[in-house]
Amino acid sequence: MIKILNSKSKNFDLALDKLLLARKNKIKLSSVSVAKIIEDVKKNGDKAIIKYEKKFNKNNIIMPTSKQINKSISLLDEKVKKAIDLAYSRIYQFHLLQKKKLSNISYTDKLKNKLEYKYVPLESVALYVPGSTVSYPSSVLMNAIPALVAGVKRIIMINPGQQGKQNSAVLYAAQKCKIKEIYSIGGPSAIAGVAYGTKKIKKVDKIVGPGNSYVAAAKKCGISEIYSIGGPSAISAATYGTKKIKSVDK
């Protein structure tokens, strides 16, 4: 439900301050909770991850089998597959052209010092793809394809599901991007798992992709290199003399 504040109301300033304070307190609270989860995963590894998966996602599976993945993909509507195929080809073409525009620099100065500037792909990267009750195959494509084009050797996906079941469209997009290492986990514990590494999860060099406020808080802890702190999408709209407020929420 969208929150509407009327600037003409007598209590507008107070209501706005209250809203901003509540958001600030939520961020502080999530940061404290996240720090405890990260420390738990650091000490107890897979055991801690499973504990939080059971608690938040009713899941006790860290890594789905190939059979489970293929079965899920087989249930996906062909129209959705074609849409993902089209998006993949367009995004891939763009980043391929982008790569061709990049050039290394190498020269020797008057003092015979050889100076170089090189573009070198990372060894490994983890894509965080939000899940549970929603589907974001676009997050897979937008984050995996640049890594694929760059030549990153190991691309893994962490995507929370409900009771171990992940979204078919997300899994198909991952398959399209040649991602063979897929984990059915999410939240701060997943971020900590790929950042520190566990017995089942090998650590990565970088973590990319959006997430909720708790995932964003985990990234802020500086436990791994990140692309950005992509938290939940938010919008604040100011309207003047219009009654079509509901249209903003669509």
Describe the role of every protein-language-model region:
Residues 29-32, 36, 44-47, 79-82, ...:
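Conserved active-site and cofactor/substrate-binding residues in soluble primary-metabolism enzymes
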Residues 36, 40, 51, 83-86, ...:
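Alpha-helical scaffold segments in soluble metabolic enzymes
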Residues 178-250:
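Conserved NAD(P)+-binding/catalytic subdomain of aldehyde/semialdehyde dehydrogenases
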Residues 108-172:
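Conserved small-residue-rich beta-alpha loop and adjacent elements
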Residues 23, 38, 130-134, 155-161, ...:
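Flexible, glycine/proline-enriched loop segments at strand-loop-helix junctions
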Residues 121-130, 174-177, 198-201, 222:
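Glycine/charged-rich beta-loop-alpha catalytic/anionic-binding loops adjacent to active sites
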Residues 57-58, 163-164, 190-191:
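Short secondary-structure capping/turn micro-motifs that flank functional sites
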Residues 1-123:
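N-terminal Rossmann-like NAD(P)+-binding subdomain of aldehyde/semialdehyde dehydrogenases
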